[in-house]
């Protein structure tokens, strides 16, 4: 039986890798979902995903959702343009199409959230995996909050903040400031403050603290994580530059200056 499970697990991993190469991310996500649901032994607390499997799961769902988030932004923009032109029939068609994309987004996000909540987080024994999964949980609740109505947005935002906070507390207690997962968490949590909670000052403070802490410890960064760490640090710095500029522009606008530039999509 154990050998059968191992073979099935290897098969799902291979299918996921094959789907990734073919850029068929829905099928990649399906393979990894099947692995989590069918191959993790409920009786073995330490039977959890390997780092490779964990990364495959993350890549699959990130890309499946990412394509639809991009579609949602485009369709929402078209819908607003049709409204501004008073083309109400076209606006209604765009709204119907947007809702279709929202249904797809909602299903994918809730699929991965259910896996995280019911299967992965309860079986996690090490702090790195715990940070990774709570960060993922925060990310997918953040995505839900992007397209939900007021009540749904608040509920999703509360869940996202709770998950990001749990990840942050674990990361700060167990991971160096240069660790890519800890840096990626700070990046996404700060974006959450900026885009979802509309708290630019707190977003800047969080991003700056993560960047400064990493710089302080940078001499000790491991060779394995050097490339990933420096990439995320650059993204933190880019966001800081943009957000600081926007804050200054907002201040100028309040004083009668020019309107600030739009926030770039993450």
Curated annotation (Swiss-Prot):
SMART domains, per database record: 14_3_3
InterPro entries recorded: 14-3-3, 14-3-3_CS, 14-3-3_dom_sf, 14-3-3_domain
Span list, region Disordered: 154-177
Pfam families from the UniProt entry: 14-3-3 (PF00244)
Biased composition regions of type Polar residues, renumbered to the chain: 158-168
PROSITE patterns on file: 1433_1, 1433_2
Superkingdom, taxonomy of origin: Eukaryota
Family per record: Belongs to the 14-3-3 family.
Annotated protein name in UniProt: 14-3-3 protein homolog
UniProt source species: Neospora caninum (Coccidian parasite)
Lineage: Eukaryota, Sar, Alveolata, Apicomplexa, Conoidasida
